[in-house]
């Protein structure tokens, strides 16, 4: 079985090696978890929540979960950017996010506005529905547009893994 490796600095200054191991599951056979989170995040979060990943994949899933729920919003200008999260008031499902300046007023559509935060959290759609492909499609599209300039940006295996390998894209908890 082919294994993909990458290294990164730990908070103690050591280099950690993460191995992205291709999955053996039928649905995503041959894909690594970084690929799955971009292609089918609903499936990933279901598997994670139900502790379906075993051994090495469980370690990788824990790392992906931490990162997928704390994606740092890229700051391009003078003003700090934040994410506004919305739900569909009719279906009560996740609707999407909008990334904009923190100084902008909160949206007027209070019935659909959920909250504002400084990170992108890919787990949010599952809080509204166990199966929400349209909510995830909107969220992943916004993420790709924010980082790559297009909702249709092709996320190859290398690009998916590079995204999750880049510590600068995530907000990590501070240890006191």
Predicted regions span which residues?
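Accessory DNA-engaging acidic/polar modules
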Residues: 1-176
